[in-house]
A protein has these predicted regions:
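Long, low-complexity N-terminal extensions
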Residues: 1-99
Length: 99
């Protein structure tokens, strides 16, 4: 995952070596639940806040709607290629929105 002059990019390589590009994705346990949420609710040109909420909705679906803010970390890379993380209060507020 990353961002360059062409915009944001998210890739997954499967065990056979095939590479797939996604606009939103999840891996690991709960992937199917996450991808179902993303496929229904993802929209191009989402705001940063909308993207965070969508990601948390996916995580919540994968965790049987029992998402705990103390186990969530959120990092953002914006179009200006600036990286930042949300602090624990910001994460708790974002998680509360999806409950």
């Amino acid at each position: 995952a990353g961002i360059d002059a062409g915009g944001p990019h998210l890739y997954e390589t499967d065990p056979s070596g095939a590479m797939m590009a996604y606009k939103a994705g999840g891996i690991g346990a709960g992937r199917n639940e996450v991808m179902e949420v993303f496929e229904k609710e993802y929209k191009d040109n989402m705001s940063e806040a909308q993207a965070v909420t969508l990601g948390l909705k996916g995580l919540s679906a994968a965790n049987e709607n029992n998402l705990k803010p103390e186990v969530v970390e959120i990092a953002i890379i914006n179009p200006e290629k600036e990286f930042h993380t949300l602090n624990s209060d910001e994460v708790a507020k974002a998680v509360k929105k999806v409950k």
